[in-house]
UniProtKB/Swiss-Prot annotation:
It is a multi-pass membrane protein. Keywords: Cell membrane, Membrane, Sugar transport, Transmembrane, Transmembrane helix, Transport. GO terms for biological process: transmembrane transport. This is Glucose import system permease protein GlcU. It comes from Saccharolobus solfataricus (strain ATCC 35092 / DSM 1617 / JCM 11322 / P2) (Sulfolobus solfataricus). Belongs to the binding-protein-dependent transport system permease family. GO terms for cellular component: plasma membrane. The keyword Transport applies. PANTHER family: ABC TRANSPORTER PERMEASE PROTEIN (PTHR43879), GLUCOSE IMPORT SYSTEM PERMEASE PROTEIN GLCU (PTHR43879:SF1). It is found in: Cell membrane. It holds the Pfam family BPD_transp_1. NCBIfam families: ABC_arch_GlcU. The complex is composed of two ATP-binding proteins (GlcV), two transmembrane proteins (GlcT and GlcU) and a solute-binding protein (GlcS). Residues 71-269 form the ABC transmembrane type-1 domain.
Length: 287
């Protein structure tokens, strides 16, 4: 009887843990959602998790009107940044992969050194690059421009893409690449026809990760944007809290609106993200 009940107890504890984690994760989302439907007075006079006594849409309407341009700006910047970072990161990961399996010991050593530098670059705080990054963007005449912000984000997210994609590309069977090279296929064609399609689950996982990171990035747009028309969502939300007071219902509504796109991406594409991680954990069986 004990042996029969053991799997049931184990499964029950598993689902209980998932339920607890889900509730903890959903509490901030719930708080943002319901407080956006309150008046500013009610937000201040009632507990944060208590539903509104009277639902009002004023905060959400006001926020949607004021955040329309920042939302568009964020999409214009985040979409190309994410795809370019993930794709170039995949190409870089394949470059390290081919070097590490080279017959030359020097090439393998160079690959290890370069990959270590790339890995180290992902841990450098963006704040530490404030002065050189700003001077670079200003000298290029790209301050307050989409290209300037995208370029700055690429500096940080291409290494991230390479680091993540290297984990997925490294589990691709070496025999496939060697067979293609024996047929006279070039590295670029091998990457486009063999490596990239096989590592697609990893590419999608990397893409989702970079999209969420780029969407939530606060430092880069804070430094490189000086005009209101170029504000991104992460910066625009900050405008609801100032030295002369805070519109709490608008702040909650703005936080909810700003979170909709990354939340939607993870809800609809989260299974591909998990599939990519499972493929990696299975030694590439799902890749």
């Amino acid at each position: 009887m004990d042996k029969k009940m053991r799997p049931v107890i184990k499964a029950s504890l598993h689902y209980l843990a998932l339920a607890i984690v889900s509730v903890i994760w959903l509490i901030p989302v719930y708080a943002m959602l319901i407080n956006g439907f309150k008046s500013n007075f009610e937000v201040l006079s009632t507990p944060v998790l208590v539903p509104p006594t009277k639902i009002t849409f004023e905060a959400y309407v006001s926020v949607l009107l004021s955040l329309a341009k920042p939302l568009i700006n964020s999409l214009i910047i985040v979409i190309p940044t994410s795809f370019i970072s993930a794709f170039l990161g995949a190409m870089g990961a394949y470059f390290f992969y081919t070097l590490s399996y080279s017959f030359s010991r020097a090439s393998s050593a160079i690959s290890d050194v370069l990959f270590s530098l790339i890995s180290l670059a992902t841990f450098i705080p963006q704040e530490a690059t404030l002065l050189p990054l700003t001077r670079l963007i200003v000298s290029m005449g790209l301050l307050d421009s989409y290209i300037g912000i995208i370029f700055a984000l690429l500096i940080f997210y291409i290494p991230t893409g390479a680091l993540l994609m290297s984990m997925f590309i490294s589990v691709i069977p070496r025999s496939l690449i060697e067979a293609a090279k024996m047929d006279g296929t070039g590295d670029l064609k091998i990457f486009m026809k063999i490596v990239f399609p096989l590592s697609m689950p990893g590419f999608i996982s990397t893409l989702i990760f970079i999209i969420i990171q780029a969407w939530n990035n606060f430092f880069i747009p804070l430094v490189l944007v000086t005009t209101p028309g170029m504000k991104l969502t992460s910066i625009a939300v900050l405008s609801y809290s100032g030295a002369y007071g805070t519109l709490y219902n608008d702040t909650f509504a703005a936080g909810m609106v700003a979170s909709i796109i990354p939340l939607a991406i993870f809800v609809f594409l989260g299974r591909y993200f998990i599939r990519g991680l499972m493929a990696l954990g299975g030694g590439g069986k799902g890749v």
